[in-house]
Amino acid sequence: MVRKAGKWMALGLTVTLLLTGCGNVQVKEAVTESEAEIQVETVEDIAPESSQETAEESTEESEEEVAMSTNPKQVVVYFANWNLNEKPADAGGEVASIPWDSVSYVNHAFWAVVPADGSTETSTERRNNGEEARTEFKIVSTDPKNDYEDTTPSAIDPSMARNHFAEYAAYSEKYPDVNIMLSIGGWSRCGYFSEMAYTQEGRNSFVQSCMEVLQEYPWIDGIDIDWEYPGGSKDGERKPEGDDDQGCPIFGTVQEDDANFALLLSDLRTALDENFGAGVKKLTACASASTAWTLPCQDWAAAEPYLDMINIMTYDLAGTWDGVTGHAGSVTGAKNAAVYLVMKDIPAEKLCIGSPMYAMALQMKSIPSGTVVGTAIESYKPTDHEIDEEELSGYIADAVSGYTIKQDGLRYVMDEEFDQGTAGWHMGYDKNNGAAYLYNDDESSSYYKWYLSYEDALSLQGKLDYIQEKDLAGIIVWESSLDLPTHEYIRQMGDQLLGESL
């Protein structure tokens, strides 16, 4: 990383320093020029002529060449515990369905923080009533039956029970080099993190509970903290979005919350090393990818020394909140977040960027005559269900215009463009930002005016190339069951990042 003319050239992006508010706190924030300036440069896209876009070209390489990576790379897949009775065993329902030979980490989602005494008073209620923080907490499964109670034989291997922990125990022996992590939190289960971390006693109780679980299940290789997010965002603390969402209240001040996050990680790191040996158990944490909204509210430089990796959730970067169509998980979005954290003195080799195995679905208000990305959208999504890669493959197969992809060695590259000249699904690819999208202009279709931002082999290839070139730690996936039935994308990751280590 070099400094030139008051700007930082790092990881292939130019960033500038701005002051921005974080709740009621002013903090230094690194903002990419693509966020700070109006987007005006032409993008060379693969799309129908009517859908050429304009956007900031923010993927230009740094003036300094960076050597190809030398550090081991990681493929981290999240596995959702609620899928056991919602999906077929071999399609994400059971742990056995994970492509174990293509991953290096499996993060089990989720466990949660709860008051140890069983009280149901929320942290928000307790804080607003002027009560002191509780001091006894523990971690519990969000689905005990699926995790360890269900003794029904596995549909894949009837010799073992189908509950997740029984299968993890078996697969940890078969794949000893794969780290199985217990992920605590998640978007809807962050309601007690802040109150727990507010006092030393609360942190001690949480850490002790983690140690007890790791001792009971020795195949668990570490803890992944998915607190979304300490210190909140520029909007302040996150409010619940539904009956099943705890939100993420802040107990105390924004500054205290942020400091307590680092203290919690320090306590966890110390306990892990003392109980299991230095570096034996892993400790990771999830970070937002929003460089202008959420990341400024967390002091990752204070947290980093205690972590093996920081998993940047570089997805959901576009949505109804923008008012226009955009890219939810582009290569540029991943680069922006990585650059931001490197500027905060986070080692690049500790950073994982994210790959979403689902589409962000938006409803355009009308079919544009020109630009598609940046088109006005409705305030609602056209569907509530999660569109996985298998469903997307059907829309792609029906596309009336777009492009094909081929393999060149291990890498995936664009092959041929096509255009049937009719209405229907149209595939587009933003070369400058590394992002795939679909939209439908067939008035007779139930998908009329739909816009889908998604990951394909090309955008994923851009991320894998960036990881190798800039020596990042690797890639995270939300989540393994959303990939194609053949796990095509996870295998693309494993083949290129893990290679002979598989």
Q: What is the role of each PLM region?
A:
Residues 18-37:
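Sec-dependent signal peptide cleavage junction
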Residues 210-255, 312-316:
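Active-site groove signature of glycoside hydrolases
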Residues 106, 182, 225, 268, ...:
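Conserved, mostly hydrophobic/aromatic
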Residues 114-147, 151, 357-466, 496-497:
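Glycan-binding loop/region signatures in secreted carbohydrate-active enzymes
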Residues 74, 80, 253-295, 350-356:
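Aromatic-lined carbohydrate-recognition surfaces of secreted/lumenal glycan-active proteins
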Residues 99-104, 108-118, 221-223, 227-229, ...:
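Aromatic- and acid-rich polysaccharide-binding/catalytic face
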Residues 198-226, 260, 264-272, 294-306:
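An active-site-proximal structural segment forming one wall of the substrate-binding cleft
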Residues 64-214, 241, 245, 326-327, ...:
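Glycan-recognition patch characteristic of GH18 chitinases/ENGases
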